[in-house]
Amino acid sequence: MKFGLNAIKAGCLKPHKRGVMVFLSLSGAVLAGGKGERMASQDKGLLLFRGEVMALSVGLALRQVTDCVFINANRNSERYADLGFEVIADDHFYQDKGPLSGLAACLTFAKTSHLLVSPCDTPCISGDAFTKLIFASNAFPDRIHYLSDAFGSHPLHAILPVEPALIILKDFLDKSERHSVMAFYEVFGCESVLWDKSEELLNVNTPDVLS
């Protein structure tokens, strides 16, 4: 079952208003715009893990909860497009600011009230994990929610209210010398969502993990 706008209309989620922010619709983005420095500059999202391209694994998990999924990538865009997703690059104005560059591009592109993001190098993530984020966001739609487990925070598995997050993020990037995802979240207002299946949060960002 998809937990986007159609699911809300069907009664699976009830639009919840807190202040002026309402959870109405959802898109998903695979973050694949990194430089892959710990992978000898390979494009991580296009590497195989257990026989499947990692960005595809993440994209298919996102498609379990929303039909509107795209990929943020700054190279090999045609190869990413061959996976069956629309591909967007970072805005040149916000380049070289780490994962926040990708977040800015995705928030700018999204046409929904909320955006789910997930990094390309966590190919074991499930739609169930995203569903838990969605329900947290439906209860408090004006906050950023991100996954955490017993080992710490996973801020790039997150759901964000698109319009207000983009406004605050641009201001944050213009004024701050810290390009920390958590620092931005704390400025905006955030909550962690516990996910107890730590194996799904495996970060495949070094050759030894890939093998």
Locations of the language-model features?
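Acidic two-metal-ion nuclease catalytic site recognized across multiple nuclease folds
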Residues: S211
